[in-house]
Amino acid sequence: MNKLYLKYFKLLIIFTMIQILILNEVMFSAYINPFLYILLIIMLPLKTPKWFLLTYAFCCGFFIDLFSSSLGFHSTATVLIAFLKPSISKITIPHNILGENDEIITHKIGIKAYLTFAFILIFIHHLSLFLIEHLSFNFNILIKIISSSLISLIIILITQQFFYRNK
């Protein structure tokens, strides 16, 4: 498990840099803000200790907040999905197909289960993030939540296929 922790802290640095230096700087449209860093929370094994999952989620969100000047919005949304991840996995991921330290990837759980699991977490993240950020809800924010969630899912799938194509 210690190797896993070390791996994920290295990935945290890489994904934070990608998010800050590339994704936050590219203007997709007024309605699309993709967030790749939440892939780290999605991929963590189901048997990850809760203390690590929540602490790691806070660190992920904190670093994005720190470099984006976003006052804790990302930390809040990321800790929320980390907290909900075990419950959502029980509903969306078939039982007994993952080993104790298996990462949650399409090759392990299947594309249908992965899309369902990942989209629910991504949607909850974006919903909470944009509602907290805007402190209101209207049609434009709904479009922003849905479009950002879909684009984030596509970017996450592409990234995952790139990293795990040979496994």
Name each model feature, range by range.
Residues 1-167:
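Terminal, non-globular segments
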